[in-house]
């Protein structure tokens, strides 16, 4: 079954913004690969180095738990924005591709997707775009909540009526408030081990994932 891959962290930032904001067409931006394909095989790490890296990450908890925490933070931000800006509403993106990206997350730099991923909060769609002043209010709320994760490096690529963007990064996290045709909030976390990897004993590499056949099995 064709499904979106985790978003590569090497994708230029403006492309990631478009991919997340225009979530319905984002499979075209990353190639529409299957989850069975894995472009990040960590060729620069030896097996022992991978084991050491994996074990050093165990204290952080699981990818799945981190994803839930980020989604809770996204809801806090969205609720605060709606309360601060009269008439503004929000909802979690319920598009099937948006849900796929939420489940799959983004690729880590040094570990493959069957070992660890960067969690993504459920994407937030706001009910209307922001005026210049309202965007400042929303960005300030994002700034305050991001700071709780130690995320403080701010930047902006666009600041005009057609396109607005506020981005804050740090500690492996990224919070992005942006609007092109509609306004969205996207949060990506640091690299976390999958729960199935945490469940394995320390000091060893997880088993290689199964290789799925490329052709379907005929039905009797």
UniProtKB/Swiss-Prot annotation:
Gene3D superfamilies: 3.30.2030.20
Localisation per UniProt entry: Cell membrane
UniProt keyword annotations, A-Z: Cell membrane, Lipoprotein, Membrane, Palmitate, Signal
A Gene Ontology cellular-component term: plasma membrane
Signal peptide: 1-32
Lipidation feature positions (S-diacylglycerol cysteine): 33
Family: Belongs to the mycobacteriales LppA/LppB family.
Name of protein: Putative lipoprotein LppB
Gene: lppB
């Amino acid at each position: 079954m064709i499904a979106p891959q985790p978003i590569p962290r090497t994708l230029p930032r403006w492309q990631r913004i478009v991919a997340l904001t225009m979530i319905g067409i984002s499979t075209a931006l990353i190639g529409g690969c299957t989850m069975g394909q894995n472009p990040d095989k960590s060729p620069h790490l030896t097996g022992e180095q991978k084991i050491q890296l994996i074990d050093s990450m165990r204290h952080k908890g699981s990818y799945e738990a981190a994803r839930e925490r980020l989604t809770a933070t996204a809801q806090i931000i969205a609720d605060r924005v709606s309360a601060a800006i009269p008439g503004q509403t929000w909802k979690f993106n319920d598009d099937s591709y948006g849900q796929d990206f939420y489940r799959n997350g983004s690729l880590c730099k040094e570990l493959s997707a069957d070992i660890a991923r960067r969690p993504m909060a459920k994407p937030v769609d706001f009910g209307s775009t922001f005026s210049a002043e309202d965007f400042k209010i929303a960005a300030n709320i994002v700034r305050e909540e991001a700071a709780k994760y130690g995320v403080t490096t701010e930047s902006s690529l666009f600041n005009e009526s057609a396109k607005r963007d506020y981005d804050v990064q740090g500690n492996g996290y990224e919070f992005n408030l942006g609007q092109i045709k509609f306004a969205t909030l996207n949060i990506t976390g640091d690299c976390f081990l999958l729960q199935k990897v945490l469940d394995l004993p320390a000091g060893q590499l997880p088993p290689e994932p199964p290789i799925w056949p490329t052709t379907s099995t005929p039905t009797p």
